[in-house]
A protein has these predicted regions:
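Active-site-adjacent "lid/gating" segments in soluble enzymes
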Residues: 6-154, 158
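Beta-rich nucleic-acid/ligand-interaction surfaces
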Residues: 111, 186, 225-229
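Beta-strand segments within the central parallel beta-sheet cores of soluble alpha/beta enzyme folds
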Residues: 100-108, 180, 286-290
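Alpha-helical scaffold segments in soluble metabolic enzymes
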Residues: 82, 86-90, 166, 170, ...
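Aromatic-enriched alpha-helical interface/lid elements that frame and gate functional surfaces
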Residues: 141-213, 217
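A glycine-rich dinucleotide-binding beta-alpha-beta segment and adjacent secondary-structure elements
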Residues: 212-261
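Flexible, small-/acidic-enriched active-site or ligand-binding loops
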Residues: 241-289
Length: 295
């Protein structure tokens, strides 16, 4: 459930009542701030959670405000994925004879945990709090996004030396005319050279040059383009239903086939069926509808 702390209890649907009926139940609770703490009952959204947790301050370019990474880090990454992981772990425990338990999945906790490697790198002296000056935050010239002559963009991720050498070759640079890859004192200079060179050709031209190489160069595609890329079509990564293009379920399993639902149910379509499945009589269900308890 995703209410603020205490709401489910007021409805008589809190974990205490539910676990009393079924001690093996796994009760998942996902909130922004968690079930406890001074902010637990406060309103908030993804941007608030990742702001307090730490990641937001490190996303963006040097000398500019932090960039908002959609709602992927807090809502989906820090919230949903950790809730799912917690529920699955608790279900494994139940299958091994343990009792069910309550999962407190706070987006602020999950967002911080996603950034665990960065916290470690910072405390070890390998990561600066100055945004846009580090390896993975657009500080490095070989891990950034560059504009091409046509106005489209390329994503570059040539971290390892062998990949970096392929990048230099594709750009037409002799290794001797470019400063050492990992010398941060020259990163800005190198980035300017890369940016100027990428602007000399269209993205399609660069993709032909880097095709088949290990330069770690890929196009930056929008949601109207990504599903049309050959890699996506060959893997069948998207599907269409009711005229809407959507990603297929991930991950993929070797034995269990996962298929997307082709049609969405209308609101209330399965209400009676669900109530019957949990033991409610037809008279009770009719009463619920009449009183507006369900729809």
């Amino acid at each position: 459930e995703g209410f603020r702390p205490g709401v489910a209890e007021k409805l008589g649907l809190g974990p205490a009542e539910c676990l009393l009926r079924n001690p093996k139940l796994v009760y998942g609770r996902m909130t922004g701030w968690g079930q406890e703490g001074p902010l637990s009952r406060s309103a908030g959204h993804d941007i608030n959670y990742i702001g307090l947790a730490g990641p937001l301050a490190h996303i963006g370019r040097n000398g500019q405000p932090p960039s908002v990474p959609l709602n992927l880090v807090g809502d989906f990454g820090g919230g949903s994925l950790f809730l799912i992981a917690g529920i699955l772990a608790a279900l494994v425990a139940v299958s091994n004879g343990k009792d069910g338990q309550i999962i407190d999945a706070a987006m602020v906790d999950g967002a911080a945990y996603l950034a665990s490697p960065l916290f470690s790198a910072y405390q070890s002296g390998f990561w600066s709090n100055q945004r846009g000056t580090n390896l993975l935050d657009s500080g490095a010239p070989f891990y950034d996004v560059y504009e091409c002559k046509c106005g489209d963009f390329l994503a570059i991720g040539a971290i390892e030396p062998q990949f970096y050498n392929h990048l230099l070759k594709g750009l037409g640079f002799d290794p001797d005319e470019i400063p050492p890859q990992n010398d941060k004192a020259y990163w800005h200079e190198t980035k300017d050279k890369f940016a100027s060179r990428f602007l000399t050709k269209r993205r399609s031209e660069w993709l032909k040059i880097f095709d088949g190489t290990d330069a770690c160069v890929s196009p930056v595609l929008n949601m109207g383009e990504s599903y049309l890329h050959q890699h996506a079509t060959d893997r069948g990564a998207f599907f269409e239903t009711c005229g809407v293009i959507q990603p297929k379920p991930a991950p993929r399993f070797s034995l269990t086939k996962t298929e997307p639902s082709q049609e969405s149910e209308s609101l209330g379509q399965s209400t009676s069926e669900l109530l019957l499945s949990i033991g409610r009589s037809t008279d009770q269900i009719s009463d619920y509808f009449a009183r507006g308890i369900v729809s």
